[in-house]
């Protein structure tokens, strides 16, 4: 029997995708070989590669103003690639809402970029999304859409006149996005859209001009990958294959509007379980900024019970509920592939646990 996986990433995958990958693992579409065994230069793989890029653009309803790049190195490599490629001679502005924005700020500073932190919620342990106003003349404005550790999420992105950069790693493909002022939108795909080893970057084509005439190593230059259709070097072929299956699955769900509707239902159910517990459970994030993806909470009346909660949950068939080492507590990551019944199972367990130990 499969466990219910609440891991923050790599995370649970739709069972039908796993079964299709299993079916095709040794014999891809009856061809007598695995997708993992063939050259990335073959027509067979190119159909997967370019098909995945087109489906990703279709889900976000993007036109040809945007290039889709498949890169390696995780979202963490983007912390350096973004300032390396997109910083000019001005200020790069960041909103600091958690560990991942702190890491991004650090990488930009290492490169000698003029970084300005225009808003931060660090003083309250990142329990909310701070009000942010970016200037009109920065090289770019940078935010992290969703914060896996602290369970906060932008409900709407800031309106900016300067190019907006969005790290969407943990709410990738979970809702529709207004791209009107987004210059670069990126994430590792291993939470909501595939397996580890692949990052997907949507970059507005005019931003690629910034990479020209810069002394950047070829592998770290966005223009290199755009001009070579993300085939400059051997890409992570199996991760792209899995991403392609995920794109098909999301389209078959009815697109991102339907996916968002289901995600909202799951989150509402879980937050109600916390809020109606008479203080036994307490969420970390301010209610107005709660994440639909990552629900971080404590057993407020007795935090010593939290390891027992995780242990008994595992015995009941639920894994991945231990909170991040920085914040502690309990965290339920309820990404796209988790269904409503699985979240309901967690809520029922939470009520039973409260009944035993309150």
Curated annotation (Swiss-Prot):
Source species taxonomy: Bacteria, Pseudomonadati, Campylobacterota, Epsilonproteobacteria, Campylobacterales
Catalytic reaction annotation: O-phospho-L-serine + 2-oxoglutarate = 3-phosphooxypyruvate + L-glutamate; 4-(phosphooxy)-L-threonine + 2-oxoglutarate = (R)-3-hydroxy-2-oxo-4-phosphooxybutanoate + L-glutamate
Residues the record lists as binding L-glutamate: 41
Family under the similarity heading: Belongs to the class-V pyridoxal-phosphate-dependent aminotransferase family. SerC subfamily.
Cofactors named for this entry: pyridoxal 5'-phosphate
Cofactor remark: Binds 1 pyridoxal phosphate per subunit.
InterPro entries, sorted: Aminotrans_V_dom, Pser_aminoTfrase, PyrdxlP-dep_Trfase, PyrdxlP-dep_Trfase_major, PyrdxlP-dep_Trfase_small
Species annotation: Campylobacter jejuni subsp. jejuni serotype O:2 (strain ATCC 700819 / NCTC 11168)
Protein name: Phosphoserine aminotransferase
Keyword Phosphoprotein: no
Assembly, per entry: Homodimer.
A single GO molecular function term of this UniProt record: pyridoxal phosphate binding
Function in brief: Catalyzes the reversible conversion of 3-phosphohydroxypyruvate to phosphoserine and of 3-hydroxy-2-oxo-4-phosphonooxybutanoate to phosphohydroxythreonine.
NCBIfam families per UniProt: PRK05355.1, serC_1
Compartments reported by the entry: Cytoplasm
Residues recorded with modification N6-(pyridoxal phosphate)lysine: 191
Enzyme class: transferase
Amino-acid positions noted as binding pyridoxal 5'-phosphate in the UniProt annotation, renumbered to this chain: 75-76, 100, 148, 167, 190, 233-234
Pathway(s) per entry: Amino-acid biosynthesis; L-serine biosynthesis; L-serine from 3-phospho-D-glycerate: step 2/3; Cofactor biosynthesis; pyridoxine 5'-phosphate biosynthesis; pyridoxine 5'-phosphate from D-erythrose 4-phosphate: step 3/5
HAMAP family referenced in this protein's UniProt entry, alphabetically: SerC_aminotrans_5 (MF_00160)
Catalytic activity, EC: 2.6.1.52
